[in-house]
Amino acid sequence: AYSDDLDGLRKIPVGFPDSLEEHLAKPVSLIPDPYGCHDSYGMHMSSILLDGLDKVGIKYEFRRAIDTYKQGLLKDQIHTILQNNTKIGDKISELVGQEKYQKYLPYFPVCANCNRLYTAESTEYIIDEKKVKYRCHDTEIGSKMIKGCGHEGEADITKDLGKLAWKVEFAARWTAFDIRFEAYGKDIMDSVKVNDWVADEILECPHPHHVKYEMFLDKGGK
């Protein structure tokens, strides 16, 4: 069981307090638990999944994204991916029509000034120093504009907190953790298509076998 708890908060879930508004775009593992029962909002949400797995008796190994990145378990893959960012950006455009990564690197540093993730977009990789240059600016997430703080800085991929974009992160994890099989939902089909190519051609590690599943529906049918 892998928790993507370094992903940023994109919106406030129904039923959660409005106090989370100030934390939009921050990694969920750096947001205080609004109910005070876990070390972060991210761990609060992960506990719901883990409780379900425990109740049905599923055996699992639990990994957190924040620990994976802090421990440097993906640093070699990040370096290789960023070295090939131009090639990857062009391939993403070719495979799924997304042009964003022809302009920005597929890596989000956590802004050193405001702790937001998605507002800090990196534009250049300094290969010999293993640092990305970034600027924190206004970014639209869903239908909401999130204000950036304007900070410009550099982030060391071996020390400073940050994460790969989903279009390349799966490939890095598959390679680092020797993943041979991974199922995925049809909503992330484009990401899997790109990650398969990144694993095979950039990281030179065969992508895992896949099974695609349909969407899970909640009680409201969403």
Model-flagged regions — what are they?
Residues 93:
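Conserved Walker
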